[in-house]
Structures are given as C-alpha cells and as structure tokens.
C-alpha cells in the first residue's frame, strides 16, 4: 500500500514538473540544439580574421574529413540567440515554416579552396547582419542555421 502511494506521488510530481517545463522530454532536438551550439555559437569572441576561422573550424570539428565550405559563428549570448525563436515564423530554404530571423554579430568563414582536411584554410568576414535560424521544441531552441 505504501509503495503504491509512493509511486502515485512520484508520478504526480513528474507530471507537475513536466507541466512547469522544468523537466523536458527529449524528442531528438536536444542533439540538434547541441550541434547548432557547437557549429555556430561563440559568444566570447568577435572573430573577424582568417586565423580565428582556421582555429575555430578545427576546434569545432568541422575539418576532420573534409573542409566545410562555409560556416557562420554567432557572437551573441545564447539567450539572445534563443530569443530569435520567438519572432514571427518565416519560410525556411527547405519549405518548412519554422524559421525565424534576427540581427546578430557574426563571423562568416569561407573555405579558400586551396587546402585539404584536416588543415583547412578559411577567409573570414565579420559583420552585424540578418540571420535565419530554424527552431524546434517547447520551449523553442535553435536547431539549424538557415542563412
């Protein structure tokens, strides 16, 4: 009897925490969110030069087997980036409507085409510009950089 009561209380607690959003079930977007963070978020730096791109692309494991042709690093706090997910939905390049846009500080890294993995070489361009990100989940989190 006491064991059944304990199970009931634990179930009630879990449902309450789920309702409050304190415990989140994983639907696969957690892995996509972590990948987005690894590939695109670097709030501590402003970037802007070729050396930065060469180092960060290697550190973030985007040069292991081939040189990723293009990547953007966002130099904003993750909460600022996540707030983009609360803006009006727009259409993504793939036709879905889970994209959102905002203006952020970025460094765009473009492969020079004259090197081979893992020693890839990049050209950097720092700017403040409009970006488009795809968001999923509840609460919504960025899972894909769309442009």
Swiss-Prot record:
One cellular component (GO) term of this entry: extracellular space
Disulphide-bonded residues: 53-109, 67-120, 85-135, 92-99
Enzyme superclass (EC): hydrolase
Chain sites annotated for binding dUMP: 35, 40, 68, 71-72, 145
Main location: secreted
Alphabetical UniProt keywords: Antibiotic, Antimicrobial, Disulfide bond, Endonuclease, Hydrolase, Nuclease, Pyrrolidone carboxylic acid, Secreted, Signal
Entry EC number(s): 3.1.27.-
Catalytic machinery residues: 40 (proton acceptor), 144 (proton donor)
One function term, GO molecular function aspect: endonuclease activity
Modified residues (Pyrrolidone carboxylic acid): 29
Gene Ontology biological process terms from the UniProt entry: antibacterial humoral response; defense response to Gram-positive bacterium
Function statement: Cleaves preferentially after uridine bases. Has antimicrobial activity against uropathogenic E.coli (UPEC). Probably contributes to urinary tract sterility.
Assigned protein family: Belongs to the pancreatic ribonuclease family.
Full protein name: Ribonuclease 4
């Amino acid at each position: 009897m006491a064991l059944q009561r304990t199970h009931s209380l634990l179930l009630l607690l879990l449902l309450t925490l789920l309702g409050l959003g304190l415990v989140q079930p994983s639907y696969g977007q957690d892995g996509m969110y972590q990948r987005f963070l690894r590939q695109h978020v670097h709030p501590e730096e402003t970037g802007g030069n070729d050396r930065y791109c060469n180092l960060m692309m290697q550190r973030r494991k985007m040069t292991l087997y081939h040189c990723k042709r293009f990547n953007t690093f966002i130099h904003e706090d993750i909460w600022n980036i996540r707030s983009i997910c609360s803006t009006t939905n727009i259409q993504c390049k793939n036709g879905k409507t889970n994209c959102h846009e905002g203006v952020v500080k970025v460094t765009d890294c473009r492969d020079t085409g004259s090197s081979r993995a893992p020693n890839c070489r990049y050209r950097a361009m720092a700017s403040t510009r409009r970006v488009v990100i795809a968001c999923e989940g509840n609460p919504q989190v960025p899972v894909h950089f769309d442009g």
